[in-house]
Every structure is written in C-alpha cells, then in structure tokens.
C-alpha cells in the first residue's frame, strides 16, 4: 500500500474546519483506492504569528519541501491587521511560493448544472462552461522594478516595469500545453501584443510552442477581448494561459462567472512541491460555527490527487461525488435556496463521502 506525504496547513479563520473536511474525504477516497496518507500538520499565517511570532516558520518550509503535496485552508483576518507589514499573515503565501519554486497558478472555472442559477450570466451562456486559467506567478509587473510617487503637482509620477524572460514564458507555456493535452487540446494565449513589448515576446514564444506541439490547437487573444469573451461566450474556452497581471484579473472574472466562490479550487505548481488551496478567504465572521462551505477545499484536494499524487481515478471519484451531492440538492448556507437540503460543514462532508464511487 502506497503512502502519500501531505502537509496540511489549516491556517486561519475557517481553515481548520475546511481542511478537516477535505482530509476526511481524501482518507475515505484513499481507503477505496488502497492508498494511505501521512498527514503532517503545520502552521502558517496568523496562527503561526500567534504561536511563533512569524507567518512562515522554517519548520513549515522544511516540511513542505519534503512532502508530496501541501493542502492549505486560508490565511489572514482582521485580528492581524495591526501587525508589522513585514510579518502579515499573507506573507506566508509569498514565502511558500518562493521556497517551493511555485511559478504557475491553475484556476479551474466550472459551472455545475445544479448551480447554474448562481451565475450572474444567463443560463444559456454558462452551459458547459469548464475551463482552466494558467497564470504565471513569479514574473511580470508585480515583481519588476518600480518607483513610488515622486515630484509635485502635475509632474508627480510613479512607474512600474514589466519584464519577462524567455525561460519564464517557456515553462508556463509547457504547463498550459500539458494541461490542454489532458483536456481538449485547446489553448488560448492571452497577451497585449499590440501595445506591450513583453507581450510580443510572450506571443512569439507561444507560437513556437504551438509549432513544437502540433497536437495542440493554440489561439492568441488580446486581454481586453478575452475579458469581453469571458462574459459573452465563456463556453468557448478550455485552457487560457497568461501573465501574472492579466491572470490576476481574468481569474477573478472567472470566479464571478461561476457564481459561488466557495466551490472554486486552485493549484500552485512549480519546480518543487505543489500547493493546493481554495480561492476564498478565511471568513473569520463564520469561523468556529461549523457552517463553512468545504467544497472548494475538497476540490483542491482532488486537484492535489490529480497533479501531485498521480491518482487521477481518486481525483475523478472526489469530483464526481461533489457533482452528485449538488445534483441531489445538498447546499451549505452560502448556496442555499428554498427547496434544497441545507447542511452544515460536517453534513456536506458526510454527503460527499457517501457519494464516493
């Protein structure tokens, strides 16, 4: 029986509740597949500040680097608003990205038929929406040189510099190609090559990757057109690959299209151990009440099984169980409507486990 080494970082707020839920689902799915998990619990974020005076202890970094995967709940909250900016809880995420070499964020956007009514778009527009945004994480304008505001009056100015090196673009394109190869084989590379020099390099390399991978259908969109297409015809997309800045914006647009942030998972992958987490925050207002929606974390765990643990059938089983639970009408409070079955965190967890294939 194979044993997977998984670091579990509950984090802050509802983090403990939702990671416990995902852990229970993974253990149940593993048991059916003849796999075991060694869960290694570590602290990061506000919980680590409270315990150790820093958001990301070296002990947590060491454990993550040695593990097969990392599953994270959420970090941050108003409790730590007044701490020194250098040790804010969110610094834990940036530190993990650096320590683990995480250069790529995968953000799936899927409309579940049972939840189509939650999307702000018309039902006919979101039918069959199921795409992945592949976002570059460590380059671009967020990490470039900058100058804060200086000067006075109408001549006051500030600037930010975007730089992309060939290797940064090549490796994110490789992830997009491999992701598409496991799906429909369609990739849209998103840039602003009609204006930005960095985008012209981006598009040049994207075209080279398309030529080197003839089984992949690569198209090229400007970011402004992509933003429009996401709300007028989102079903056309399968894999979108883009820069750090554009990916940040388009990922949030995609999340809104889904209509339920509580369901959306994400993965950050790179040269070392990969990190999996739901896209929602720590929700301190409902922490400890047992009513948080655990599905985003459960689906993040499914991504972990698929991308890091080489357990695609386990990932399928978890994802299919979530779909089945939604189809039969189970809803946590954030998704509840009259006529459905309202459940708390534990109730949703039990329902998913009961529907595992």
Predicted regions located by residue number:
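N-terminal beta-loop-helix "entrance" segment that forms/cooperates
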Residues: 34-58, 228-230
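Glycine-rich phosphate/diphosphate-binding loop of Rossmann-like nucleotide-binding domains
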Residues: 7-24, 29-30, 153-224, 236
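Buried hydrophobic packing segments
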Residues: 22, 26, 206, 297-308, ...
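Glycine-rich phosphate/nucleotide-binding loop
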Residues: 46-49, 230-330
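Buried hydrophobic positions in well-ordered alpha/beta secondary-structure cores of metabolic enzymes
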Residues: 12-15, 68, 134, 176, ...
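Glycine-rich phosphate/pyrophosphate-binding loop and the adjoining helix
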Residues: 138-139, 144-183, 187-189, 193-195, ...
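N-terminal glycine-rich phosphate/adenylate-binding segment common to multiple enzyme folds
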Residues: 50-159, 245
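Extreme N-terminal starter segment of soluble prokaryotic enzymes
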Residues: 2-6
């Amino acid at each position: 029986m194979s044993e997977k080494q998984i670091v579990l970082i509950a984090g802050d707020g509802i983090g403990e509740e939702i990671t416990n839920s995902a852990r229970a689902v993974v253990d149940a799915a593993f048991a059916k597949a003849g796999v075991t998990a060694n869960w290694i619990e570590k602290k990061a974020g506000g919980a680590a500040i409270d315990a150790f005076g820093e958001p990301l202890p070296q002990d947590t970094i060491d454990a993550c680097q040695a593990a097969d995967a990392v599953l994270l709940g959420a970090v941050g909250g108003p409790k730590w608003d007044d701490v020194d900016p250098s040790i804010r809880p969110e610094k834990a995420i940036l530190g993990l990205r650096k320590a683990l070499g995480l250069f790529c964020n995968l953000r799936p956007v899927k409309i579940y038929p049972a939840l189509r009514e939650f999307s702000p778009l018309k039902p006919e527009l979101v039918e069959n929406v199921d795409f992945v945004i592949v976002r570059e994480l460590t380059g671009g304008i967020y990490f470039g040189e900058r100058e804060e505001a200086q000067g006075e009056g109408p001549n006051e100015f500030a600037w930010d510099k975007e730089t992309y090196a060939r290797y940064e673009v090549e490796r994110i394109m490789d992830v997009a190609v491999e992701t598409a190869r496991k799906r429909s084989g369609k990739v849209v590379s998103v840039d602003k090559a009609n204006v930005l020099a960095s985008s012209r390099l981006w598009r040049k390399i994207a075209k080279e990757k398309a030529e080197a991978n003839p089984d992949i259908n690569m198209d090229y969109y400007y970011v402004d057109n992509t933003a429009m297409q996401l709300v007028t015809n989102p079903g056309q997309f399968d894999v979108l690959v883009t820069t750090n800045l554009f990916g940040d914006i388009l990922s949030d647009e995609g999340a809104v299209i889904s209509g339920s942030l509580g369901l959306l998972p994400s993965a950050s992958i790179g040269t070392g151990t990969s990190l999996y987490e739901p896209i929602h925050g720590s929700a301190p207002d409902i922490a400890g009440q047992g009513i948080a929606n655990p599905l985003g974390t459960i689906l993040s765990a499914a991504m972990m099984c698929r991308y890091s643990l080489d357990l695609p059938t386990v990932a399928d089983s978890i994802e299919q169980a979530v779909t089945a639970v939604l189809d039969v009408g189970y809803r946590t409070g954030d998704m509840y409507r009259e006529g459905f079955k309202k459940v708390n965190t534990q109730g949703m967890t039990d329902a998913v486990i009961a529907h595992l294939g």
